């Protein structure tokens, strides 16, 4: 049976980005396990490893394949599939990794990011701000999915708290138990779309995906009765096709979400707007005279908790110590794998 890769998100742009040599085939990475990968092709799934050449030329871990990447495969003499090339990425969801400047790629080539947060004991708007920061920087559309609505007794209060930190971001309230809100997810799950599910451990990502699949493919565990939290189940990233023709990427719960690069101006739009009114262009909003942001805090327009969260994320973002040239190089490496790959894409674009 021939697999239709359009249902896995294949586009004409992807096909143009990858030049296949004789005998090579196109595929998309649907699973990653240490140094080998699961790849879906028109002929079905293959297990593959990167070639020595690709590994040697990789300038950083970001240049290695990740779940969601489109790749070219070849077969060696022993019929072992090898990854020869990676297509330029249309979007990259990444987070900072402890003691590493290059960050960790979570998923690539995604259209939408479902930021899942449960409405029970897991509810935390400061954590939501972190997820929004990496989501805005990814190039994909963030959507907030509030799960376990059936367990919530103060929904209106929580919705106001979410709205205060997520202006312009769609928010969906749902419950797998009652079916509430599940229809609102469908517009993002049409043929060719790829949606990544992110969120802390136990918020119900796998349970929600199983409901969308119509069968229990992903392992789940019940809620703990002592603290009303779900148990962490997913241990690796995987891309799964839905009956609707879309693909979803389930990701392990992230206990610590370090910020590598992120668009704080999107997540904290009101603070970014106020900052333009500060007396000094390099105002840190701590003790400088003429600070419009601190003035807003004093009158209650911006909460002190919101400002503290903004400042904390600023401090920990790894690009704080980088100059503009280094930041540009880091983003090129993450999206294209290097300047040479970016040049090839630009040359093809101008020819077209």
From Swiss-Prot:
Molecular-function annotations in GO: GTP binding; GTPase activity; metal ion binding; rRNA binding
Residues the entry annotates as binding GTP: 147-150, 199-207
Essential cofactor(s): Zn(2+)
Residue ranges annotated for the CP-type G domain, each copy included: 100-257
Parts forming coiled coils: none
Keyword Iron belongs to the record: no
Note describing how the cofactor binds: Binds 1 zinc ion per subunit.
Pfam families: RsgA_GTPase
InterPro entries per UniProt: G_CP_dom, P-loop_NTPase, Ribosome_biogen_GTPase_RsgA, RsgA_GTPase_dom
Cellular compartments per GO CC: cytoplasm
CDD domains: YjeQ_EngC
Family annotation (SUPFAM superfamilies): P-loop containing nucleoside triphosphate hydrolases
Subcellular location per the Swiss-Prot or TrEMBL entry: Cytoplasm
Annotated HAMAP family: GTPase_RsgA (MF_01820)
Subunit: Monomer. Associates with 30S ribosomal subunit, binds 16S rRNA.
Biological function: One of several proteins that assist in the late maturation steps of the functional core of the 30S ribosomal subunit. Helps release RbfA from mature subunits. May play a role in the assembly of ribosomal proteins into the subunit. Circularly permuted GTPase that catalyzes slow GTP hydrolysis, GTPase activity is stimulated by the 30S ribosomal subunit.
Protein name: Small ribosomal subunit biogenesis GTPase RsgA 2
Native organism: Lactiplantibacillus plantarum (strain ATCC BAA-793 / NCIMB 8826 / WCFS1) (Lactobacillus plantarum)
């Amino acid at each position: 049976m021939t697999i239709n890769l359009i249902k896995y998100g294949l586009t004409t742009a992807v096909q143009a980005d990858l030049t296949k040599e004789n005998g090579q085939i196109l595929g998309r990475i649907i699973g990653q396990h240490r140094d080998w990968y699961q790849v879906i092709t028109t002929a079905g799934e293959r297990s593959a490893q990167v070639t020595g050449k690709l590994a040697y030329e990789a300038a950083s871990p970001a240049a290695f394949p990740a779940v969601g990447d489109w790749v070219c495969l070849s077969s060696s003499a022993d019929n072992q599939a090898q990854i020869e090339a990676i297509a330029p990425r249309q979007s990259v969801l990444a987070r900072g990794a402890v003691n590493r400047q290059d960050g960790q790629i979570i998923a690539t080539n995604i259209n939408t990011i479902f930021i899942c947060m449960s409405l029970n004991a897991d509810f935390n708007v400061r954590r939501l701000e972190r997820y929004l920061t990496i989501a805005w920087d990814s190039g994909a559309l963030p959507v907030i999915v509030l799960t376990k609505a059936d367990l919530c007794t103060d929904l209106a209060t929580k919705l106001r708290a979410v709205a205060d930190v997520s202006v312009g971001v769609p928010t969906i309230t749902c419950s797998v138990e009652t079916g509430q809100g599940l229809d609102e997810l469908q517009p993002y799950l049409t043929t060719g779309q790829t949606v990544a599910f992110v969120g802390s451990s136990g918020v119900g990502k796998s349970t929600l995906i199983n409901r969308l699949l119509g069968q229990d493919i992903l392992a789940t565990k019940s809620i703990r009765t002592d603290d009303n939290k779900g148990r962490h189940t997913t241990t690796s990233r995987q891309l799964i096709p839905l009956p609707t023709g879309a693909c979803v990427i389930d990701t392990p719960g992230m206990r610590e979400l370090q910020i590598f690069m992120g668009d704080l101006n999107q997540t904290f739009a009101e603070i970014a707007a106020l900052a333009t009114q500060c007396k000094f262009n390099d105002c840190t909003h701590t003790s400088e005279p003429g600070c419009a942001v601190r003035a807003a805090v004093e009158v209650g327009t911006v909460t002190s908790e919101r400002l503290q969260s903004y400042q904390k994320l600023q401090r920990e973002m790894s690009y704080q110590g980088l100059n503009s040239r280094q930041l540009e190089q880091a983003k090129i490496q993450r999206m294209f794998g290097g300047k040479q790959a970016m040049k090839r894409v630009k040359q093809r674009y101008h020819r077209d």
